[in-house]
Amino acid sequence: MHVLFSDRFKTREDPLKYLRGLSLSLFNLNPKEFPRELFGREKELDELVRFVKSRRWIAILGPRMVGKTSLIKAANVRLEKMGVKAIYVNLWGAKGTHGLLNALAQGLNTENSILQKIKGIADRTEGVSFGPGGISISLSKRPMTTMWDLLGAIGKQAGDCVIELDEVQELSTISGHLLKLLANIFNTHPNVIFILTGSMFGLMKTLLEPRSTSPMYGRSPAKLYLEPFTKEKSSEFLKKGFQECHEAITKEQIEEAVEKLDGIPGWLTLYGNNVAIRKLPHKKAMEETISEGTKITKDELEHFLQGRDRTTYLAALKVAATSARWKEIKAAIETRRTSVPNDATVQNALENLKAAMLINEKEGVYTIKDPMLRTLLLTSQIT
């Protein structure tokens, strides 16, 4: 997820004072950067590093705000000690091949050692230029060829390297071309390992469940799933965070936060920051957490709905917010559309919502786990 909390701080009077001196705090709102900053993800961190050591590509799956970005950034510290460089590529909002190229360029510009190694080859690539600020991308007549040349330069010159594509489902519009490109990298440059994060739909689903005709058939990444915290782990997280900040808080207040924020690390962090850093009283901190969380969630849901049947998807989500069975969801869609949807339309919407990890299904009952999404839908803040 890439509507970063730090971006939201831009609306506050003095955002830096809330972060000053807290680079290692559990309640720092930026993605964690070091293994020691992670909480409750030791097993997943070890597994991720083990996969890279064995040169296995990895897909990190999980709902929004669960800590996927923090996990890969913390892993990078361990990987660098092993002599493996990492290029972090933020794909949130990237459109098409040019969007991917620009995102890759931004990632390369933070890894100067790799940039210097590939400069000789990349500088001769169409659409690629170097300046004082590093590498930049201009419009290319053959952007996928430019991408292949750039990745090829990394494969030939950078040594052991991990390329992290965060929110890979953003590239669904170029799935066909990208699958061929990834297959070529897999076959040609075994020193280049891809780590992919996102939800199980679009390009990610195609990568993890390739058909026999897919270029990636037989090359599927290993899956690493990040679960929300249990109630016990959520309580432990908050207690440790408040201890770090020397902030007193009651058992009852922690229990209420755990109950309302439902194990999502991002929301627990936001609540802790509101109490320990902004010094808001518990009740006000809960209100601010829910208000800010629903704004972030609304932005992300609007992004997901782009290019989709908004009426159908919102009808399904709204009825699932109070839990519903398939027939009830179909009836809600029919009411909102004022026409009878066919079964395939309903099923397709539900499958996409499950793949995007917006809804859960258990024994035929559809529910929404994320408390911010439930609040957003039940309070009619999105129509």
What is each residue range found by the language model?
Residues S140-G202, E209-R211:
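Conserved Walker B catalytic segment
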Residues S54-V66, S70-C161, A344:
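P-loop NTPase nucleotide-binding core
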Residues N30-K32, S291-Q306:
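Short, Lys/Arg-enriched N-terminal segment that forms or immediately precedes the first helix
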Residues H2, T11-K17, G21, S25, ...:
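C-terminal leucine-rich, beta-strand-based interaction scaffolds used for sensing/assembly
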Residues M1-I58, M372-L373, T383:
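A short, basic N-terminal segment
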Residues Q243-D299:
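Amphipathic alpha-helical "lid/sensor" segments that cap RecA-like P-loop NTPase cores
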Residues T206-E259:
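Helix-loop-helix "sensor" segment of P-loop NTPases
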Residues R41, T69, I264, D370:
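Short, conserved phosphate/pyrophosphate- and ester-handling motifs at nucleotide-, phospho-/glycolipid
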